[in-house]
Amino acid sequence: PTQLWRLLVNNAPVSLKAVLLGGAAIPVELTEQAREQGIRCWCGYGLTEFASTVCAKEADGKADVGSALPGREVRIVDDEVWLRAASMAQGYWRNGQLYPLVNAQGWFATRDRGIVHDGKLTLVGRMDNLFFSGGEGIQPEEVERLIVSHPHVLQAFIVPIEDEEFGHRPVAVVEYDAEAGSIDLAEWVKDKLARFQQPVRWLTLPAE
């Protein structure tokens, strides 16, 4: 999504007709701007181990990434996304030995947290990104998705900082568009996030 944002914001001449987006939350504003310039946007979920795309759909503003493509299977085990496919990497090559990717039934545990509803996969975040603040679990990706839904936010990252009282507290690092002006995101999220999810500091991502 970041590279497409920059193409559109800089008014760069493009001949794109369609683009597959992934790797981060996809703001509706981004796909709408792209559509106005004749670019169809698709969102997907994939891994290198599976020769990339596992699920895909045309972007429609909904949180899911679509259904499994032919030859791919998705299941949820203890909140974790497991995958199985007709074609995938044989394993990881380490120290002259091939280590298999999958369990005895052929399933690969991705360490991604997700849910499946009506056959469509929605990603919640990485299992190992979850942190706790005052005993409450915070999934950074969930907070990031909310922040990037603001029309003047290009991308956002939530990182935990250590805190003596709470254990950890969330901090937001945000990239704004050129028309952002003076936005008070701390005020904007007050009725959209639980108190424990609200960042205690807001930092601006430095320009490249």
Listing of model-derived features with the role each one plays in the protein:
Residues 21-24, 45, 84-86, 134-136:
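Glycine-rich beta-strand-to-loop/alpha-helix junction loops that act as flexible
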Residues 194-208:
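AMP-binding/adenylate-forming catalytic domain of the ANL superfamily
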Residues 54-58, 77, 84, 175:
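Short beta-strand-to-turn element immediately C-terminal to the catalytic PLP-Schiff-base lysine
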Residues 67-71, 77-105, 136-138:
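Conserved ATP/PPi-binding loop(s) of AMP-dependent carboxylate-activating enzymes
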Residues 21, 158, 203-204:
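Hydrophobic/anchoring residues in structured secondary elements
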Residues 7-62, 73:
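Gly/Ser/Thr-rich phosphate-binding loop
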Residues 85, 113-198:
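AMP-binding/adenylate-forming catalytic core of the ANL superfamily
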Residues 3-4, 25-26, 88:
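Alpha-helix capping/helix-boundary segments
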